[in-house]
């Protein structure tokens, strides 16, 4: 009866969801919003600033946001008041300093705009000091020993380069989080420091090379994978509720064997969910662009258009939050765990990274003739060198207990770091190293054999899905990230590594005359390739042969998080981060401690959950089934029916 009642409840819920989807579709058809008209409507954007700020203050704010100038204290009150007026016009009653502590997820504390003016009266107020600084309890967040209960003071500091927004009647102000002594206690502060380090190093090198460049910025487009499952089914699984993944279970009769889920047609329920997700993200200024079914059943992906790394990081945090919150509106649960189900693919987050000039010119764009693009080839050589020298840091940047289940499991890149460049770039670099002239032999037209179709232009590189760090036309795609990872750490490390190599190149080229620059650059590229070409690999990263070859080349294979994390504070890594003012020694040691603690706590929680389920759910079910079988056997015996053992039956098989 209980099972029948539960099934009836599920049927009623599903019917209700279908009716609501149809109703929502009809209502949406009536109002048919145009995205252009409401995109970013909940963001305190530059157009909103123009409307709410005096012109002189607006210009100063643009200098802060675009040129990195310090915010004058005298305009802080004006900006805060304008921000409050805009937010209240959007229905906001509270504000919060929105930050990203070392938990990897966002944190917020909501304060109302009201201030008392009498026994029963208030005034809405928001001042510059409240905008610029907040004070949460730093000891209540992971700090790796940087803070304790008896020294708990911490500060949040407004980040004016990431736009404030309104969500659920609250003004969200993106902020940094630091301790009383200025130590970074969050994910965002080191990311901004690494952006500064890369900007400084890249501008210096490019100007030495003869390019008049004043500023560069890194850009990222993170592709977000996730699973959707029915909410009622989710609630039946204690392991999913507690750990985000299944700890027990049987393989389904049909998984992903037929390759028929990838890019498949979307159900009405999922389509309605995606439409609501898109609308919520577009209101928040997130460039949600592409969505589709992924390889595993019930797995999907959402990919945005790239934007500056700091904003991309904030927007990815918003994306994960919206994906999970909107799911409940449709009777669904969004799973962001890296490996929620055994036997099918897990979920990752491809990090598409590049950097460009202040005019928007992509430094990693090879152009029509990559072999003649000496700027691109120089930067490419620096990246190759950096990835080879700091394999351990790139592996550490994606290390987690959940991601260990994905990496190297024939669904995600292996734990061995390598670079894939594609046929053309690999051939160009081989020719440069050998001192030969590169001859282009690649056929760039694809003939489909259909008379009505013209030839299709073919990319110069194929797509190697097994490579952890692949060049994909005008960017590098770092594919090792787990689906729920905060992208700040991988990008902080990547920025710092590249900043170091560009600095070394600049040191070597600083005294070279301009007329000798091309010759010096080619010699530098040749030397770099001779020393670091071992990191370049174009084959199948899933194969056992590659593991053997990688060992011969001397590449690291840090299979698990426990193998990788102790390398975080190796002397060369400490020196790297301190040199570029990204982490101090204490900040780096703290992060190593936090990650190790998180690793064993996650594993411990999973073990406790398994033991509880075994004792309270699985063993009682087994004992109950055994009792039923024993009762059946006893009933048959009392009826004169002889029980035949399984072993006896097998003995008669031929």
Predicted regions and their residues:
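Gly-rich Lys/Arg/Thr-decorated short loops/hinges at beta-loop-alpha junctions or inter-strand turns
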Residues: 35-45, 254-262
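Glycine-rich, acidic/polar active-site loops that bind/position phosphate-bearing ligands
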Residues: 151-336, 345-348, 354-593
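Active-site core of metal-dependent hydrolases
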Residues: 21, 38-151
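A short, hydrophobic C-terminal helix/tail in secreted or cell-surface proteins
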Residues: 651-654
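Short, positively charged and aromatic/hydrophobic N-terminal segments
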Residues: 15-24, 28
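Single conserved hydrophobic/aromatic residue that forms the stacking wall/gate
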Residues: 1-11, 648
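Generic long, charged, amphipathic alpha-helical segments
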Residues: 635-649
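C-terminal substrate/ligand-recognition segments
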Residues: 604-625
């Amino acid at each position: 009866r209980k099972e029948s009642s539960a099934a009836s409840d599920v049927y009623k819920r599903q019917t209700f969801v279908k009716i609501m989807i149809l109703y929502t579709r009809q209502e949406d058809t009536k109002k048919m919003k145009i995205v252009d008209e409401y995109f970013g409507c909940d963001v305190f954007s530059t157009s909103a600033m123009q409307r709410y700020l005096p012109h002189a203050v607006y210009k100063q704010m643009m200098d802060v946001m675009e040129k990195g100038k310090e915010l004058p204290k005298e305009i802080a009150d004006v900006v805060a008041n304008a921000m409050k007026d805009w937010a209240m016009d959007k229905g906001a009653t509270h504000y919060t300093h929105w930050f990203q502590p070392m938990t990897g997820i966002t944190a917020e504390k909501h304060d109302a705009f009201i201030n008392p003016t009498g026994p029963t009266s208030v005034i809405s107020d928001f001042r510059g000091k409240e905008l610029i600084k907040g004070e949460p309890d730093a000891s209540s967040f992971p700090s790796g020993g940087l803070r304790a209960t008896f020294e708990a003071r911490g500060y949040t500091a407004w980040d004016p380069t990431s736009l404030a927004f309104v969500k659920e009647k609250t003004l969200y102000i993106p902020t940094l989080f630091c301790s009383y002594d200025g130590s970074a206690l969050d994910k965002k502060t080191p990311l901004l420091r690494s952006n500064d380090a890369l900007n400084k190093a890249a501008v210096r090198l490019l100007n030495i090379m003869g390019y008049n460049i004043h500023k560069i910025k890194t850009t990222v487009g993170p592709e977000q994978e996730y699973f959707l499952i029915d909410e009622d089914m989710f609630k039946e699984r204690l392991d999913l509720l507690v750990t985000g993944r299944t700890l027990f279970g049987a393989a389904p009769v049909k998984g992903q064997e037929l390759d028929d889920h990838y890019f498949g047609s979307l159900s009405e329920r999922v389509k309605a969910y995606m439409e609501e997700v898109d609308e919520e993200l577009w209101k928040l200024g997130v460039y949600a662009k592409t969505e589709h079914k992924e390889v595993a059943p019930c797995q999907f992906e959402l990919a945005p258009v790239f934007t500056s790394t700091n904003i991309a990081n904030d927007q990815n945090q918003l994306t994960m939050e919206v994906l999970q919150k909107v799911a409940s509106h449709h009777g669904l649960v969004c799973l962001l765990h890296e490996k929620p189900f055994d036997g099918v693919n897990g979920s990752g987050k491809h990090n598409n990274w590049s950097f460009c000039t202040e005019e928007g010119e992509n430094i990693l764009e090879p152009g029509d003739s990559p072999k003649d693009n000496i700027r691109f080839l120089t930067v490419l050589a620096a990246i190759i060198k950096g990835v080879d020298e700091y394999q351990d840091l790139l592996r550490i940047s994606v290390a987690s207990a959940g991601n260990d289940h994905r990496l190297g499991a024939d669904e995600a890149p292996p734990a061995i770091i390598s670079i894939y460049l594609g046929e053309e770039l690999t051939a160009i670099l081989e020719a440069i190293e050998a001192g030969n002239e590169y001859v282009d032999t690649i056929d760039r037209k694809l003939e489909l054999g259909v008379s009505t179709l013209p030839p299709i232009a073919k990319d110069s590189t194929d797509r190697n899905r097994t490579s952890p760090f692949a060049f994909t036309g005008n960017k590098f795609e770092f594919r090792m990230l787990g689906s729920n990872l905060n992208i700040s750490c991988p990008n902080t490390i990547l920025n710092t590594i590249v900043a170091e190599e560009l600095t070394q190149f600049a040191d070597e080229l600083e005294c070279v005359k301009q007329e000798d620059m091309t010759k010096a650059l080619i010699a530098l590229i040749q030397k770099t390739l001779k020393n670091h070409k071992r990191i370049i690999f174009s084959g199948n990263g899933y194969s056992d042969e590659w593991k053997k070859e990688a060992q011969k080349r001397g590449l690291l294979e840090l299979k698990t998080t426990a193998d990788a994390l102790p390398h975080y504070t190796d002397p060369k890594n400490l020196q790297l981060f301190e040199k570029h003012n990204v982490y101090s020694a204490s900040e780096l040691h703290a992060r190593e401690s936090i990650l190790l603690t998180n690793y064993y706590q996650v594993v411990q929680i999973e073990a406790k959950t398994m033991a509880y389920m075994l004792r309270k759910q699985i063993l009682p079910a087994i004992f109950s089934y055994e009792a039923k079988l024993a009762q059946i056997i006893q009933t048959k015996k009392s009826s004169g029916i002889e029980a035949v053992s399984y072993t006896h039956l097998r003995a008669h098989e031929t």
